[in-house]
Curated annotation (Swiss-Prot):
Record GO terms (molecular function): ATP binding; tRNA(Ile)-lysidine synthase activity
Record note on domains: The N-terminal region contains the highly conserved SGGXDS motif, predicted to be a P-loop motif involved in ATP binding.
EC top class named in words: ligase
Binding site for ATP: S27, G28, G29, V30, D31, S32
Family: Belongs to the tRNA(Ile)-lysidine synthase family.
One Pfam family matching this protein: ATP_bind_3
Subcellular location: Cytoplasm
Name of the protein described by the UniProt record: tRNA(Ile)-lysidine synthase
ATP-binding as UniProt keyword: yes
GO biological process, one term: tRNA modification
């Protein structure tokens, strides 16, 4: 236990800063159970704020029992614990493993504020399994990098303190100090790829090559170093290609080799937290989207969104529901939360650049996203035009034209966020501020 705690402390000391909250992903399995115990001791020695989160996937009839046990164990450790219930769309065609993982991290992200640490219990055996799964998929160096000890997550940092520790050492330590934990029956089901590797393949590899865990960790680390070097070497090129609106310049891409183009597109999508495309999809992005006829409106659908082209730039467009039927009333200096994670909208009276004159009955101000049939007379234009025409003049991509907030007074357009104020409502009372998500 002592050597494992010293290893745990060393990792946490690397990332922990005063006033940092530490959140532990707590499933109740042996890995996270020991992780909670290590955190309990570290907390007593360092007096930090801690919280545990159990994610209830609803996949096992025992999940309620596990949730109760986790809350009891967390209370015994003096650490608060939340239970997050998630719903999985099992008819989506995606694997249960992937759905559960994505839902789990979405739930955990809700508990992370800027600068916080999220601790997860992945260990050396998990690393071997992840490496082999990436190999099975035909992944390149990025996929074969497997899991890093730390990575940015939800404004904080995800840390894996047990990544260099084997499962057998974790189980032996937990038994020696008298810990109880839960056993998820699904972990025995070898129909799942990870379980197949865990129960049938990795034991054989370990018996034949006892140092396989260290070898995999070394290969994963070398792959990660190669990835970091490529990013470093192409950093200045990527900076020129990336535009202020987070689009990617096709002109900048065109002067480089196909290999560099593919890498730059991957760097771009990684920056936008999008799933990585396959080799085939990368070729299609360039051949069918970037190089499409100038009068075309090309797009390539991927899992989380689609790649579009506009004015010789590539755009990543996430899937969003239609918001044109949505309306919301807005009040002075009170942020209005927009639907579909489109940010907030505020009529700020304390702005240094006021450009809107408030109408006689500001309580009638409302926000819509539907430009259909609306006209406006921007202060920079000589006459009124349909919003459809104005969007074209202001170079707004077609897919964004129904995702831009329109401030209305009765049936009149007051302003279109980030574009213009109607001449009738031009003044110095307030400013319309649209804070978009990062």
């Amino acid at each position: 236990m002592e050597s494992l705690y010293q290893q745990f402390s060393h990792v946490l000391n690397t990332y922990y800063q005063p006033q940092t909250k530490v959140v532990v992903a707590f499933s109740g399995g042996v890995d996270s159970r020991l992780l909670l115990e290590l955190l309990r001791r570290y907390r007593e020695e360092n007096s930090l704020s801690c919280h545990a989160v159990y994610v209830h996937h609803g996949l096992s009839e025992n999940a309620d029992i596990w949730a109760d046990k986790c809350q009891v164990w967390a209370k015994q450790a003096g650490i608060s614990c939340s239970v997050e219930r998630v719903n999985l769309d099992t008819n989506s065609g995606e694997s249960i493993e992937l759905l559960a993982r994505e839902a789990r991290y979405e739930a955990l992200a809700r508990h992370i504020n800027r600068g916080d640490l999220l601790l997860t219990g992945q260990h050396a055996d998990d690393q071997v399994e992840t490496f082999l799964l990436a190999l099975k998929r035909g992944s390149g160096p990025k996929g074969l990098s497997s899991m890093a000890e730390s990575m940015p997550f939800a404004g904080g940092t995800l840390v894996r303190p047990l990544l260099n520790t084997k499962r057998e050492q974790i189980e032996a330590t937990a038994k020696n100090i008298g810990l109880e934990w839960v056993e998820d029956e699904s972990n025995q089901d070898t129909r799942y790829d990870r379980n197949f590797l865990r129960h049938r393949i990795v034991p054989e590899l370990s018996e034949r090559w006892p140092s396989i865990h260290q070898a995999v960790q070394r290969s994963a680390s070398l792959c990660a170093q190669q990835e970091a070097l490529l990013d470093e070497l192409l950093g200045s090129v990527f900076a020129r290609a990336l535009q202020a609106d987070l689009s990617l310049s096709i002109d900048e891409l065109a002067i480089h080799s196909e290999l560099a183009q593919a890498r730059l597109i991957r760097m771009w999508l990684s920056k936008l937290n999008a799933n990585m495309p396959s080799q085939t999809q990368l070729r299609l992005i360039w051949q069918e989207v970037a190089l499409a006829q100038q009068d075309a409106n090309p797009k390539l659908k991927l899992k989380q969104g689609e790649i579009r082209r506009f004015q010789n730039k590539l755009y990543w467009v996430t899937h969003r529901a239609d918001v044109t039927s949505w309306q919301g009333h807005i009040q002075i200096d009170e942020p209005l939360i927009l639907p579909e994670s489109l940010g907030t909208l505020t009529l700020s009276s304390g702005s240094h650049q006021p450009n809107i004159s408030l109408p006689s009955h500001p309580e009638l101000l409302r926000v819509t996203f539907n430009p259909e049939g609306l006209s406006a007379h921007p202060t920079t234009r000589s006459r009124s035009r349909k919003l459809k025409k104005l969007f074209q003049e202001y170079n707004v991509p077609s897919w964004l034209r129904r995702q831009i907030p329109i401030l209305m007074y009765k049936d009149q357009v007051v302003a279109v966020a980030d574009l213009f104020v109607d001449q009738t409502f031009s003044g110095q009372d307030c400013e319309l501020i649209w804070r978009k998500p990062l």
